Amino acid sequence: MIDREGYRPNVGIILCNARNQVFWGKRVNQHAWQFPQGGINAGETPEQAMFRELEEEVGLLPGHVRILGRTREWLRYDVPPHWTRRDNRGLYRGQKQIWFLLRLTGRDCDVSLRASAHPEFDAWRWNEYWVPMEAVVDFKREVYRLALEELERYLHRDLRYLRQHTRRPGERREVPFDLQLKP
């Protein structure tokens, strides 16, 4: 399903843990790290596609996560011609993505890279939110930066929510959080 401009609709997923570290998956048999992502099927909403991709690539179900936010607009990247199949050249330019920021409410052991018959990742790790992007394929870096910048504000909102809801009634002291968010 490619639009008139040559972009395939897609979702990207930034999954973070309670320490605001983000999930990075290592592509099978490659040295490239990336966030989970995948195409939107005909008749699917971006949210439905996100939950399907999350289960296929990371093994997480809707009950394992909470949606913190999503990008307002499509973010696009062009795929270099040598990365596309010959039969798609001329029709396919790249991907347009809606990005979701999710909070893992489950546990690390809920992550399963073998949830589908064709795994995308063979390793995963948690990294700081603003990790350098050298390990990301170069043509995706700008979209990653834009998605991280737009969605970062939801982390601060979520931290305020967590702080407000972890105090006991009548307690006046701040809950100690030693999270360091980079600007």
UniProtKB/Swiss-Prot annotation:
Gene that encodes the chain: rppH
Keywords from UniProt, A to Z, are: Hydrolase
Where is motif Nudix box found?
A: 38-59
Q: Name the protein family.
A: Belongs to the Nudix hydrolase family. RppH subfamily.
The UniProt record lists the Nudix hydrolase domain at 6-149
The protein's Enzyme Commission number: 3.6.1.-
Top-level class of the enzyme under EC nomenclature: hydrolase
- State the InterPro entries in the record: Nudix_hydrolase (IPR020476), NUDIX_hydrolase-like_dom_sf (IPR015797), NUDIX_hydrolase_CS (IPR020084), NUDIX_hydrolase_dom (IPR000086), RppH (IPR022927)
Function, please? Accelerates the degradation of transcripts by removing pyrophosphate from the 5'-end of triphosphorylated RNA, leading to a more labile monophosphorylated state that can stimulate subsequent ribonuclease cleavage.
* Entry keyword annotation includes Repressor: no
Question: This chain belongs to which protein, by name?
Answer: RNA pyrophosphohydrolase
What GO annotations for molecular function exist for this entry? pyrophosphatase activity
**So which cofactors does this thing need?**
a divalent metal cation
